[in-house]
UniProtKB/Swiss-Prot annotation:
Pfam family, one: PhoU
Keywords noted in UniProt: Cytoplasm, Phosphate transport, Transport
Its job: Part of the phosphate (Pho) regulon, which plays a key role in phosphate homeostasis. Encoded together with proteins of the phosphate-specific transport (Pst) system in the polycistronic pstSCAB-phoU operon. PhoU is essential for the repression of the Pho regulon at high phosphate conditions. In this role, it may bind, possibly as a chaperone, to PhoR, PhoB or a PhoR-PhoB complex to promote dephosphorylation of phospho-PhoB, or inhibit formation of the PhoR-PhoB transitory complex.
Cell compartments where the protein resides: Cytoplasm
Biological source species: Enterobacter cloacae
Name of the protein in question: Phosphate-specific transport system accessory protein PhoU
Length: 241
């Protein structure tokens, strides 16, 4: 379900400006998705060259965030958008902030992997790689949903985070077992726990982007809402009922 309609303005230039910003967001999203995928690969394969490329590439992500942010400020000042147009611009501003933070996670994963892990830690990395791929797919899907402002898909992705949380909890239990069985693994396990938590937070970031889609489509703030209450709000019902 595509909820975008950018061909309604009297000013064709306004349409072009909105479309340009949306295109930049999707470019940034694709860049961050690739950064994250490469970071997971670099960590799992202990590929130092790939890790260094990811670290270097984070600068480009940061530059894109600044450029899109400035474009949004200009369009607000120049066009004074209202209603759905304003919601779209605000959703974009918030979404690029989430994408920038996901890019930071990719950077941190690579820096940590370069400093702390070696081939002897491979068993610790297998589960992290699986969790990482799960969040990469989640990011891919939420970017697709954002491009179309697809409410139904955003709801599905929002709920997918529960599976990411469950996978993360399983990894924590596994890593705690490693530490109890061999105290010599404590430093590397603590590093793996840090990476696991960072990856799990990507799922939360994707949930936040889903909330911005809800906000654009429904015109209502869905932050800090979950479970049955979320279902009622999306259906247009009073959550107190």
């Amino acid at each position: 379900m595509d909820n975008l309609n950018l061909n309604k303005h009297i000013s064709g230039q306004f349409n072009a400006e909105l479309e340009s910003i949306r295109t930049q967001v999707m470019t940034m999203g694709g860049m961050v998705e690739q950064q994250l995928s490469d970071a997971i690969t670099a960590m799992h394969n202990q590929d130092s060259e790939l890790a260094k490329r990811v670290i270097e590439g984070d600068k480009n992500v940061n530059m894109m965030e600044v450029a899109i942010d400035e474009a949004c400020v200009r369009i607000i000042a120049k066009r004074q958008p209202t209603a759905s147009d304003l919601r779209l611009v605000m959703a974009i501003i918030k979404t690029i902030a989430e994408l920038e933070r996901i890019g930071d996670v990719a950077d941190k994963i690579c820096r940590t992997a370069l400093e702390k892990f070696s081939q002897q830690h491979q068993p610790l990395l297998v589960s992290l790689e699986s969790l990482g791929r799960h969040t990469v797919q989640m990011l891919h899907d939420v970017l697709d949903a954002f491009a179309r402002m697809d409410l139904d898909e955003a709801v599905r992705i929002y709920r997918e985070d529960k599976k990411v949380d469950q996978e993360y909890e399983g990894i924590v239990r596994q890593l705690m077992t490693y530490m109890m069985e061999d105290s010599r693994t404590i430093p590397s396990v603590l590093t793996a726990l840090f990476c696991a938590r960072s990856i799990e937070r990507i799922g939360d970031r994707c949930q936040n982007i889903c909330e911005y889609i809800f906000y654009f489509v429904k015109g209502q703030d869905f932050r800090h809402v979950g479970g049955d209450e979320l279902d009622k709000l999306l259906a247009g019902k009073d959550p107190k009922e």
